[in-house]
Amino acid sequence: MQPNDITFFQRFQNDILAGRKTITIRDASESHFKAGDALRVGRFEDDGYFCTIEVTGTSTVTLDTLNEKHAQQENMSLDELKRVIAEIYPNQTQFYVIDFKCL
């Protein structure tokens, strides 16, 4: 069985499959992805594969420069996005935005 290239919390699976979530914000450990990469996607909780995505772009962002567009692409409010990022990556300020589409 092929390993997954990237994982998402299960709560995001339906939004990804429906095209409502089109970016992910990660820390430096996942900053190596580039436009054109096809990635196998699994659930964080059980590593179960659920789709393949294509990276369509990448950029950098800080917690302070997150904006409404990022929130819309994540399918959540800006306040919720900032809270989620701060919970997942405590004490970090520099992040990497990965734009993607389902294949």
Swiss-Prot record:
Give the catalytic activity: N(4)-acetylcytidine + H2O = cytidine + acetate + H(+); N(4)-acetyl-2'-deoxycytidine + H2O = 2'-deoxycytidine + acetate + H(+); N(4)-acetylcytosine + H2O = cytosine + acetate + H(+)
- EC number(s) from the headed UniProt entry: 3.5.1.135
Q: Where is the ASCH domain?
A: 6-94
Q: Which Pfam families match?
A: ASCH
State its role.
Catalyzes the hydrolysis of N(4)-acetylcytidine (ac4C).
Transmembrane segments annotated in the record for this chain: none
What one GO molecular function would you report for this record? hydrolase activity, acting on carbon-nitrogen (but not peptide) bonds, in linear amidines
Active site location? 21, 24, 74
- Paired cysteines (S-S): none
Q: Which GO terms describe its cellular component?
A: cytosol
What protein name does the entry list? N(4)-acetylcytidine amidohydrolase
Q: Which UniProt keywords apply?
A: Hydrolase
Q: Does the keyword DNA damage apply?
A: no
User: Known Gene3D superfamilies for this protein?
Assistant: Hypothetical protein
**Family statement:** Belongs to the N(4)-acetylcytidine amidohydrolase family.
